[in-house]
Amino acid sequence: MSVRSYVAMTCAGAVALSSSLAFAHVSVSSPGFANQSQLLTFGIGHGCEGADTSKLEVTIPSSVTSVRVVPNVFGPVEIKKDDAGNVTGVIWTNPQPRAADEMYYQLSIRAKLPDAPFTTVLFPAKQTCKDKDGKESVVDWKATPEEVAAAKEGEEPEPAPAVLIVPVRKLGWNKFTIKEKLTDLTAFDDAQIVWSGAAAYSSNPATKDQIKNEDGVTELKEIAAGAEVWVKY
């Protein structure tokens, strides 16, 4: 059975697009759609050395616009703006930190992401914690993916919350032009299959095996700038 036929038969088993929130650090729901307003939720997976989170300050990049803060469990928030009135940061303060680090918090905004498919937007965050004795500690979640990848043994840079931007799509086949070279194909992990010429990519293990065993088909590992791809969702 060909890869194309196999994918058509396994449509019902395709992975649906979902917002992921990591539980190991401060994260943000991802992916997000290019040039669209949507809910972005920051997840605070843990406090600091056993202390509860007392405050989270998130920097809003200039490419992210139309920011609105969603009511949250912490209560009133501080919204920082520049001289033009653009939101540059949001500060959530927990009025009653718990005596122990035992909560998973979610804090949300609604915002419009830039029209830049297959790029990543970072939201540097500063997490403040307060223990039962009132002692504060701070963690800066600001490292870029490049800094995290380049970290030496023993180094543990704190990654900034990141949103992977994907183009708006429809069910079925979609044709996209890649503007910049793409070496990380996880942007397509919710797709059934991606084709670029005679090369194909899928995050689905069964489809991946079909790609490897199909005559005349190679595994797609990166996509050149300017290349056209066909993606089935």
Model-derived regions, located:
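Boundary at the C-terminal end of the N-terminal hydrophobic targeting segment
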Residues: 22-24
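Low-complexity, serine/threonine/proline/glycine-rich extracellular segments that form mucin-like
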Residues: 29-71
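Short, solvent-exposed loop/turn segments enriched in Ser/Thr/Gly
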Residues: 35-40, 52, 105, 119-123, ...
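Extracellular adhesion/glycan-binding regions together with long Ser/Thr-
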Residues: 78-102
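Low-complexity, intrinsically disordered segments enriched in Ser/Thr together with acidic residues
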Residues: 95-119
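Extracytoplasmic/periplasmic copper-protein system
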Residues: 130-171
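N-terminal exported-region signature
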Residues: 168-233
